[in-house]
Each structure stands twice: as C-alpha cells, then as structure tokens.
Amino acid sequence: MYRSTKGASKARRDQINAEIRNLKELLPLAEADKVRLSYLHIMSLACIYTRKGVFFAGGTPLAGPTGLLSAQELEDIVAALPGFLLVFTAEGKLLYLSESVSEHLGHSMVDLVAQGDSIYDIIDPADHLTVRQQLTLPSALDTDRLFRCRFNTSKSLRRQSAGNKLVLIRGRFHAHPPGAYWAGNPVFTAFCAPLEPRPRPGPGPGPGPASLFLAMFQSRHAKDLALLDISESVLIYLGFERSELLCKSWYGLLHPEDLAHASAQHYRLLAESGDIQAEMVVRLQAKTGGWAWIYCLLYSEGPEGPITANNYPISDMEAWSLRQQLNSEDTQAAYVLGTPTMLPSFPENILSQEECSSTNPLFTAALGAPRSTSFPSAPELSVVSASEELPRPSKELDFSYLTFPSGPEPSLQAELSKDLVCTPPYTPHQPGGCAFLFSLHEPFQTHLPTPSSTLQEQLTPSTATFSDQLTPSSATFPDPLTSPLQGQLTETSVRSYEDQLTPCTSTFPDQLLPSTATFPEPLGSPAHEQLTPPSTAFQAHLDSPSQTFPEQLSPNPTKTYFAQEGCSFLYEKLPPSPSSPGNGDCTLLALAQLRGPLSVDVPLVPEGLLTPEASPVKQSFFHYSEKEQNEIDRLIQQISQLAQGMDRPFSAEAGTGGLEPLGGLEPLDSNLSLSGAGPPVLSLDLKPWKCQELDFLADPDNMFLEETPVEDIFMDLSTPDPSEEWGSGDPEAEGPGGAPSPCNNLSPEDHSFLEDLATYETAFETGVSAFPYDGFTDELHQLQSQVQDSFHEDGSGGEPTF
C-alpha cells in the first residue's frame, strides 16, 4: 500500500484538470463561451452532449432526400422559430437546448445548462410536479402533450417581466434507441413557446412569425371583448373570414358551458391593475357548426387600451390537461392566500378526456341557426336585423356608446338607448353588426319602463353572479313597454312612496306592503273584487308575450320600507285575524318568499266584509227597510210585555178583555183569555234572555213570527195553580168542554220538573256562549253581550245596549 504524499495528490489533480480542459476543447461552443466555463460547467455540458450523441447515433435515420436543407439553413429555421427547442429524457436529463433560448429567457444556452444537466434545474420549483405528471402520463408515442410551466430567467429579464416567464410546451415522446437505459428513459422532444403579451412584431395586422411556425392566431378586443381586429389565420382554424368577425362579440362564439369560466377570467383581467394576464380554455364555434378547443391568453394594454389575445388551437386531450392544471393552480392560490372564495376557473367539475373528446349533440347547430339557452325567469330578447347597415369602427377607437340607426322605432326606445350602456365583461351577441357593443342594456338589469324614466341600476361585475347574469349570445332583447303594467310601480309612484317611507326592522325582501304601493288605476270591476294569488298573477304575467318584468320591485333589494303611520287603516280593508291590532300597532304576518318577478294584483276589499271597526248590522247587505225594522221593534215590545205579565196576577181588565193588541197586531186567541176569578199564572224563574242581536242571521223575508207560536209558548204557563184558593168546582175554571186543565193536579215532583224545564238551555244556547273563545276575535264585539235581568215599561233593557 502506497502512502499518499503532497506531490502525488497534486499530480492527480493536474491530470484531472488536463482531461477537463481537453473536454472543453471538444465542446461545440464558441470560444467566447468556453473561456467563461468553470470545471463543473464543462463536466455538465460534456454529459449533455454525450447523451445527445449516443441518442441520435443509435436512432433511426430520418427518411427523405439528404441534402434538402443544409446545416446553415436548418440553423436559420430554428433561430426564426417563435420559441426554442428542448430535448430531455423522461427522468428530466437534458439532451439539447437550442441557442434561441437566450432571446426568450435572457440566459444563454451555456448559462442555463451550466446550472445543471436536468430540466428541473431551469424551471420554477412550483411547476416541478406538473412536469413530472406530464412525463409519467401513459399514452401512445405519437400523441402530443401540451402543458405550461415557468422557466427561470435572468435578473435583468425578471426586473422587466416581474417574475419567471410562462412557457407553453408542446411535444411528444420518440421511439427510443436500443439499450436498457433508453428503454427506461424515453426521450421527449418539445417546442417551447413563451406566452408573451407582445409577440414578435409582424407585418401589420396580418400573420407574423408566431402564427407561421405555431398553431395560433391573434386578436384584439375592446374592454367588453368585442372583436376589433383578428389575424387572417383564423380562416384555417375556425373557417371565418376576417371581415365576418369584425365588430362581433367574442362571447357569441363561446360554447354555452364555457360562459361562466370565460366571464370570471374576463372580470379578473379588468379588476386587477398592472400588467396581468388571464388564461382560459374554451370552445369556440367554427363556421361549419362544430366546436374547436382554444387556449386563450389575454393581456390588458393599460386601463384605456384594448385587450390582446393569443389563441392556440389545442386537441381534446390537451384541453383536458390544461383545464386540470388551471384548476389546480386556482385551488393552490386560494389556499395560500387564505381566500376560499376565489374566482372559479370552471363552474362544474373538470371534464374527463372522454367528455372532452365526445361531441355534445346538444350544441351542434349551424352558425346561421339561432343559438340560445332558455332561463326560467329571463325575459325574451329581440334580434337586430342582419340587413341593417351599421358603421364600421374607426381606427381611433372610441369606447363611448354608439347610436342606433334611424328607423320606425318608438320614441321611448330612442330615449332609452341613450342611457343604456353595455357593462363588461358581458356583451350580447347581435348578428347585425357592432351597434350592440356599447348601447344595449343587460337583460337582467332592473329598469322601470316609463317614458321619462332615467332610473337604471348599473350591474357591477361580481364573481358570484356571472353564471346567473350571462345569457347566450344570440339572446334577443324586447321592445320597451309604452305603458306600465297593471299593478307595477311607476316612476312617480316610486318617488312618492320613497319620500313617505322609513326603514323598519322587519325584513321582507323583494316585496312591498299594499299600503305603500301606488297603482296606476283603481280596480273597480266586479271581476277584480277578489284577491289574486301570487302564483296565479305571476304565471299570468309570464304568459303575456309583450311584458317584461324587473327582477325586483324594490329599487334597492337590501332595503325594505314601511309606512310611517300605524297599520290600523290597513286592517280596515282586510279581514280580521288573531293578530289584528286594536291600538294602531304594526303587526306583520310572514309572507311567502317568491323567486323571480313578483307582481300581485290587490283589488278593493268588498264593502260589506266583517271588520272589528263596523258592526254587521251597519253594513250594506245587513240593512232592513224602515217598515221591516218597525215591525221587528213592535214584536220585541210585545214579547217583553208578555214576559212582564208572568211575574204578576192578571187584573180584572186583563181577564175581561184579554191582552190588548200591541202595535196593531191581531188579538190573541180566546183560549189565552183568562177570567178575573181564575188563578194567577205560575211564578217560574225563567232563564234571562240573552240580548245579543242574532236576528241578522235570519232571512228578512221570514223574520216575522206568527201569533200561533207565541200562544204555544205561553199556553201551559198561563194555566191556574192548583195550590191557590180560586173557587173549587167553579165551572169557569175548567177548560173547554168542562174538562179540567192539564195543570190542575200537579205533584211536587211535576212542579220541580217544570221549573227545571223552564230553565233548561237548548243545544243552540249552550253552543253559543256569551263570551268569545280564547284566541277568537269577536266580530260582534260592539253589540251588547251582557245579560239583562229586567226590562223597562217601554220594552228596552235595563242598561243601554251601546
């Protein structure tokens, strides 16, 4: 064993350094780059070029004529590409990196490769997992893969772009050469296109180098994504001519299922300040009626400038992969920022590869056919005629509203068109031209259609309501109404009740109290003398083709107003309820919650409806004529005098003449006439008469009682008492024919039974109590409910009734 000495160690180091310098001379690099290389950089580059040489030497030679392009021509083509070429193995080992990478990342190829021989050394650590997933995803060798990641850039470039550069990678795996190493590490060749907001300048608006060497077309949009300019290459991917798409809304080409995703990214682009970008994976409709997956990258050129979009046509599998990646990034951003309510990238679950590749038969209509999706409560919209000649936009873009062409439109519509604006990010699609860009209103915007109306609720873009506000691009707008609906608040009524209303603690969203609503005209017809249920009224309004409804009747859905005065006058016109107030307090009952437009017709309440404030006898259909009322009063007086006569013996005058007829009534039958020698009437304790006026329940035509029933009531009570001495054996004391009266010989038991019978309550008297039940409002509370024990000479009660 030889002991290492100082001289031997130095000799070995010198030998290793000499070999490294020899390797440096073999590297295909410029002399200027070789001078800057360290020993570690030289060894790293040597490994890369060795793997590259082995792979291409053992691979299958390219088919085709040799000498078609020279080496210099190939280098020129690679240098002209709008990106750089990248070759690496499945485990991430680099094989090749083109020289053009320095134009996009700021680093030269030598600087990047010198950092390490793995692709993970030159990409952002946050995207390592994405690249690993793409490299391990099983698929056929000829299947393209498309994903995006961020590459490290130089310090100077990072200062300009505020971070690493986002790069779109498209590539595929190649057949590996023979060998165990290549069998486990297939080679992936990719073209990397930096996603730049300002690609290399091309000759005017036509195709530039980016569109020549990459499947891509560019477009410029207004703030509402109306197309201002588009590349001619759109003809290749969508089949449209450039002139056919100018002044059209970009939303008109979108698939209905992608509206929410696109609008959310559009809002994010407009809401954030600075140099930001928005990404989306959507389906655009081709001229043939099919759908093409497009990866869109949008940049805003300042707060007043237009929006630039780079559109990359992708396959179904690439769309599925990109959607997964975008969704995962949004989820991670929400977790890091601690904001779970981030903008959703996609409204629904991520589509599978089969769903992306399969054609949806529901959306295969031709381009010329109307394309729309019906919403339950959305108003119908009208289509602008395609034959209308609309002005072309000038080169100096003006983002103010455009006027409608003159025509036989109502003056109301012309007046409304000046106040209505198009709120981004939604622009309705009108096939007639670009007049819709800045002059039509939102379909769900709350607007009161009155001739002098200037009320307009500007819809602020919200992340939670985009999917509810967006309608398909071919949706049509209705003509404004020339008169308000029946029961709908007008501008005058809105101002009147807003001045008289104050907030209340009780909340009734989307509804108005009947006392605060002002109706255009009274409902006086008998057909309207009945309350219309809300569901019936709402359905009736929906069935009307010429009526539109605001989403809410209240101008501010977060505030509810109630009248300042008490609610007593409200209850004067409504039926009584257990919670009806008596002292003017406001007691509100719960109202049903209805989604959508609320329109309820409230006609006048019938005049004769029972209320606590008015006695039933005072209502119109309870009135009697003067003659009928006089007859009823005389009958009551006669019954009262008959009841008083039972408490004292009949006098001689009464015995000789009988009862005098009262009030012109015919005299009673002779069977009731008693002689002076007769016995007195039984002194029975009769049950006090209840003085509730229940006569209004009877039919006025059959109100008068005949004399015969009155005789039957007092027949047995007027017979003489056998216990008194009134001349035994007197023939006058006997009844007709000499037969004794049936009440002559009564035992004490029979006498007690008659007393009980006189005080017995019938079933009707027992059921009708003098006092109301608990929780029951006595509708007849103004009538006297106290029991009267005696009557005056004139027949009135002991105490006044009212």
From Swiss-Prot:
<dbReference type="GO" id="GO:0060080">
    <property type="term" value="P:inhibitory postsynaptic potential"/>
</dbReference>
<protein>
    <recommendedName>
        <fullName>Neuronal PAS domain-containing protein 4</fullName>
    </recommendedName>
</protein>
<keyword id="KW-0804">Transcription</keyword>
<dbReference type="GO" id="GO:0001228">
    <property type="term" value="F:DNA-binding transcription activator activity, RNA polymerase II-specific"/>
</dbReference>
<feature type="region of interest" description="Disordered">
    <location>
        <begin position="466"/>
        <end position="485"/>
    </location>
</feature>
<feature type="region of interest" description="Helix-loop-helix motif">
    <location>
        <begin position="14"/>
        <end position="53"/>
    </location>
</feature>
<dbReference type="GO" id="GO:0000978">
    <property type="term" value="F:RNA polymerase II cis-regulatory region sequence-specific DNA binding"/>
</dbReference>
<feature type="compositionally biased region" description="Polar residues">
    <location>
        <begin position="532"/>
        <end position="555"/>
    </location>
</feature>
<dbReference type="GO" id="GO:0007614">
    <property type="term" value="P:short-term memory"/>
</dbReference>
<dbReference type="GO" id="GO:0030154">
    <property type="term" value="P:cell differentiation"/>
</dbReference>
<feature type="region of interest" description="Disordered">
    <location>
        <begin position="506"/>
        <end position="555"/>
    </location>
</feature>
<keyword id="KW-0010">Activator</keyword>
<comment type="function">
    <text>Transcription factor expressed in neurons of the brain that regulates the excitatory-inhibitory balance within neural circuits and is required for contextual memory in the hippocampus. Plays a key role in the structural and functional plasticity of neurons.</text>
</comment>
<feature type="compositionally biased region" description="Polar residues">
    <location>
        <begin position="466"/>
        <end position="476"/>
    </location>
</feature>
<dbReference type="GO" id="GO:0048167">
    <property type="term" value="P:regulation of synaptic plasticity"/>
</dbReference>
<feature type="coiled-coil region">
    <location>
        <begin position="624"/>
        <end position="648"/>
    </location>
</feature>
<dbReference type="GO" id="GO:0000785">
    <property type="term" value="C:chromatin"/>
</dbReference>
<dbReference type="GO" id="GO:0007612">
    <property type="term" value="P:learning"/>
</dbReference>
<dbReference type="GO" id="GO:0071386">
    <property type="term" value="P:cellular response to corticosterone stimulus"/>
</dbReference>
<dbReference type="GO" id="GO:0032228">
    <property type="term" value="P:regulation of synaptic transmission, GABAergic"/>
</dbReference>
<feature type="coiled-coil region">
    <location>
        <begin position="5"/>
        <end position="38"/>
    </location>
</feature>
<dbReference type="InterPro" id="IPR013655">
    <property type="entry name" value="PAS_fold_3"/>
</dbReference>
<dbReference type="GO" id="GO:0044877">
    <property type="term" value="F:protein-containing complex binding"/>
</dbReference>
<dbReference type="GO" id="GO:0007616">
    <property type="term" value="P:long-term memory"/>
</dbReference>
<keyword id="KW-0524">Neurogenesis</keyword>
<dbReference type="GO" id="GO:0000977">
    <property type="term" value="F:RNA polymerase II transcription regulatory region sequence-specific DNA binding"/>
</dbReference>
<dbReference type="GO" id="GO:1904862">
    <property type="term" value="P:inhibitory synapse assembly"/>
</dbReference>
<feature type="domain" description="PAS 2">
    <location>
        <begin position="203"/>
        <end position="273"/>
    </location>
</feature>
<dbReference type="GO" id="GO:0098794">
    <property type="term" value="C:postsynapse"/>
</dbReference>
<keyword id="KW-0677">Repeat</keyword>
<keyword id="KW-0832">Ubl conjugation</keyword>
<dbReference type="GO" id="GO:0033554">
    <property type="term" value="P:cellular response to stress"/>
</dbReference>
<keyword id="KW-0805">Transcription regulation</keyword>
<keyword id="KW-0175">Coiled coil</keyword>
<dbReference type="GO" id="GO:0000981">
    <property type="term" value="F:DNA-binding transcription factor activity, RNA polymerase II-specific"/>
</dbReference>
<keyword id="KW-0238">DNA-binding</keyword>
<dbReference type="GO" id="GO:0005667">
    <property type="term" value="C:transcription regulator complex"/>
</dbReference>
<feature type="region of interest" description="Disordered">
    <location>
        <begin position="717"/>
        <end position="749"/>
    </location>
</feature>
<dbReference type="InterPro" id="IPR035965">
    <property type="entry name" value="PAS-like_dom_sf"/>
</dbReference>
<dbReference type="InterPro" id="IPR011598">
    <property type="entry name" value="bHLH_dom"/>
</dbReference>
<keyword id="KW-0221">Differentiation</keyword>
<dbReference type="GO" id="GO:0005829">
    <property type="term" value="C:cytosol"/>
</dbReference>
